[in-house]
């Protein structure tokens, strides 16, 4: 049931929601992934130009500013930025934002429940693929969810220095992810395919989650490469011992979306305080302050 404070969706909006349940999510995603890899010369350059114009992509931030410099749409979509395009906050007590986009939700984790949108919440256990022990670590903690729109830079960075403890691939649905659907599809973020990364940091245990969506062709990390495809029907888990530890620095790239979606960060109770300016809909960029050490 929808929250009484929310407007009921219109007829066309209800059709849009219903379509999410019946469309061939996987086949659309596979097709989009195949198309995005093709190198069709001037045709590819023309498509990239149309996309950049439609979504107002700022090409002046990119290392390669000309459309002709991108051999495929994938290459364009995960384009690196100029080194000076994003400044990483140098305050040692601050954690920085991992992605460009807008705040979808942020705040306090009520016991083991996170807010997805007004009227919709989801559980930590569901989000973390049934890992009850991991979920307990974040009871009464803090969280931040960042939505990456098509125009945004789609590489994901580290909020702080960290050591990778565990990575979990979770198969799932491929619903489209955007603010409207977050309000109308229950448990969307805990149902979609995702990659969960668990880190040890001086700010306590931190989780950073890459959430997939329709036409998210792949998600990758700098230590493991492309995680999907191939897509598995089972949860996969990798643990990292001291011998195989992956050390990452604040602001360092940790992963990327090829056509992207959402990044979720989880923090333990009484470890950090989210920055005051963060609120639903606020635009954010890599390197800006996410939270401060308590």
Swiss-Prot record:
An individual GO BP term: phosphatidylethanolamine biosynthetic process
Gene Ontology, cellular component aspect: plasma membrane
Keywords recorded for this protein, A-Z: Cell membrane, Decarboxylase, Lipid biosynthesis, Lipid metabolism, Lyase, Membrane, Phospholipid biosynthesis, Phospholipid metabolism, Pyruvate, Zymogen
UniProt keyword annotation of tRNA processing present: no
Domain of life: Bacteria
Residues carrying the site annotation Cleavage (non-hydrolytic): 260-261
UniProt membrane topology term: Peripheral membrane protein
PTM info: Is synthesized initially as an inactive proenzyme. Formation of the active enzyme involves a self-maturation process in which the active site pyruvoyl group is generated from an internal serine residue via an autocatalytic post-translational modification. Two non-identical subunits are generated from the proenzyme in this reaction, and the pyruvate is formed at the N-terminus of the alpha chain, which is derived from the carboxyl end of the proenzyme.
Cofactor-binding details, from the entry: Binds 1 pyruvoyl group covalently per subunit.
Keyword Cell division: no
CC cofactor: pyruvate
Molecular function terms, GO-annotated: phosphatidylserine decarboxylase activity
Coiled-coil positions: none
Subcellular location: Cell membrane
Reactions mediated catalytically: a 1,2-diacyl-sn-glycero-3-phospho-L-serine + H(+) = a 1,2-diacyl-sn-glycero-3-phosphoethanolamine + CO2
Catalytic residues, chain numbering: 100 (charge relay system), 157 (charge relay system), 261 (charge relay system), 261 (schiff-base intermediate with substrate)
Pathway as given in its UniProt record: Phospholipid metabolism; phosphatidylethanolamine biosynthesis; phosphatidylethanolamine from CDP-diacylglycerol: step 2/2
Pyruvic acid (Ser): residues carrying this PTM: 261
EC number of this enzyme: 4.1.1.65
Similarity comment: family membership: Belongs to the phosphatidylserine decarboxylase family. PSD-B subfamily. Prokaryotic type I sub-subfamily.
PANTHER family: PHOSPHATIDYLSERINE DECARBOXYLASE, PHOSPHATIDYLSERINE DECARBOXYLASE PROENZYME, MITOCHONDRIAL
UniProt subunit comment: Heterodimer of a large membrane-associated beta subunit and a small pyruvoyl-containing alpha subunit.
Purpose of the protein: Catalyzes the formation of phosphatidylethanolamine (PtdEtn) from phosphatidylserine (PtdSer).
Name by which UniProt lists this protein: Phosphatidylserine decarboxylase proenzyme
Protein's organism: Histophilus somni (strain 2336) (Haemophilus somnus)
């Amino acid at each position: 049931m929808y929250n009484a404070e929310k407007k009921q969706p219109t007829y066309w909006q209800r059709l849009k929601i219903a379509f999410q349940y019946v469309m061939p999510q996987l086949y659309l995603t596979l097709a989009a992934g195949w198309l995005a890899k093709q190198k069709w010369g001037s045709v590819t350059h023309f498509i990239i130009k149309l996309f950049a114009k439609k979504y107002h992509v700022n090409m002046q931030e990119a290392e390669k500013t000309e459309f002709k410099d991108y051999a495929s749409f994938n290459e364009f979509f995960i384009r690196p930025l100029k080194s000076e395009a994003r400044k990483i906050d140098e305050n040692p007590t601050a954690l920085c934002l991992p992605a460009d986009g807008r705040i979808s939700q942020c705040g306090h984790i009520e016991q083991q429940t996170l807010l997805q949108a007004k009227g919709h919440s989801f559980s930590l256990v569901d989000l973390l693929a049934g890992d009850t022990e991991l979920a307990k670590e974040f009871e009464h903690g803090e969280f931040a969810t960042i939505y990456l729109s098509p125009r945004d830079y789609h590489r994901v960075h580290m909020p702080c220095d960290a050591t990778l403890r565990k990575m979990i691939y979770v198969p799932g649905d491929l619903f489209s992810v955007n603010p409207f659907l977050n309000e109308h599809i229950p448990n969307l973020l805990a149902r979609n395919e995702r990659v969960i990364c668990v880190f040890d940091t001086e700010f306590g245990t931190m989780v950073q989650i890459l959430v997939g969506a329709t036409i998210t062709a792949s998600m990758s990390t700098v230590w493991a490469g492309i995680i999907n495809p191939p897509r598995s029907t089972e949860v996969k888990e990798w643990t990292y011992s001291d011998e195989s530890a992956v050390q990452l620095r604040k602001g360092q790239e940790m992963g990327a979306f090829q056509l992207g979606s959402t990044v979720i960060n989880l923090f333990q109770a009484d470890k950090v305080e989210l920055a005051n300016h963060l609120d639903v809909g606020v635009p954010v960029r890599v390197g800006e302050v996410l939270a401060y050490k308590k």
